[in-house]
């Protein structure tokens, strides 16, 4: 009887050890910079995207959750918007922020679009991109800084999706932000260089490229 109990105990131990040694693959569902944001709002790795049959619209470049900000991160639109002006006339307060540390591009873009005293050609162009609740907008200086920090990560993915890579050299690398210049809000706003990370204050009636971004929402 004792020997039978010993054999049973040994068999149970062997089963438990085998279970411990078994490897179970758990799918990695974490969204990371370089993942692809699709038109339906899902974010996929490139391998998943290739198998999905979905349409890509942007590449994820930031996934940090920050207090006081909406959404679950940011994705950069695959394509540039043709050069357009911040405003079609000077001397008008458009209600956008001059805080270069604020992640407020979405609010700024709406303020530009909603101003009645002057039009914002770049804001109007960005509003035309809105699809399925994934609302594109003009990034603030702070959001462009986040994009600049990972531009070499997202550029290869943008290219593979048929988009426009962010310029990394000193030529044709300037983009409008939605942040105005403090103390000169009615006349100037900031350009941002994806080649160097530099900023340049610029009259708002000048036409420059825009690279919209999207807030990811679950």
What are these regions (language model features)?
Residues 76, 138-139:
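Short hydrophobic beta-strand that contains or immediately precedes a catalytic carboxylate
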Residues 20-132, 204-218:
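Short, compositionally biased
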Residues 120-135, 141-193:
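An exposed tryptophan-centered "aromatic clamp" motif
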Residues 1-18:
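Sec-dependent bacterial lipoprotein signal peptides
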Residues 10, 69, 168-171, 185, ...:
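A generic structural signal for short, non-catalytic loop/turn and secondary-structure boundary residues
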Residues 15-18, 36, 159:
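Secreted/extracellular small peptides and ectodomain modules produced from precursors
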Residues 78-81, 192-196:
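Secondary-structure transition/turn motif
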Residues 195-203:
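Active-site rim elements
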């Amino acid at each position: 009887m004792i020997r039978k109990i010993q054999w049973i105990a040994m068999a149970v131990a062997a089963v438990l050890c085998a279970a411990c040694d078994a490897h179970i693959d758990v799918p990695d569902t974490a969204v990371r910079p370089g993942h692809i944001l699709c038109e339906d709002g899902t974010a996929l790795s490139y391998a998943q995207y290739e198998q999905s049959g979905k349409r890509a619209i942007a590449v994820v470049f930031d996934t940090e959750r920050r207090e006081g900000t909406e959404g679950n991160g940011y994705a950069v639109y695959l394509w540039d918007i043709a050069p357009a002006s911040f405003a079609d006339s000077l001397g008008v307060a458009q209600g956008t922020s001059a805080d270069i540390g604020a992640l407020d591009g979405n609010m700024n873009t709406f303020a530009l679009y909603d101003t009645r005293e002057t039009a914002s050609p770049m804001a109007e162009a960005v509003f035309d991109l809105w699809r399925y609740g994934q609302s594109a907008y003009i990034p603030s200086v702070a959001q462009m800084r986040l994009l600049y920090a990972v531009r070499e990560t997202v550029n290869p993915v943008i290219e593979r999706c048929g988009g426009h890579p962010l310029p990394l050299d000193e030529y044709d690398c300037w983009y409008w932000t939605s942040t105005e210049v403090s103390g000169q809000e009615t006349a100037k706003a900031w350009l941002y260089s994806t080649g160097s990370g530099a900023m340049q204050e610029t009259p708002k009636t000048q036409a420059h490229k825009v690279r919209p971004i999207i807030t990811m929402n679950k």
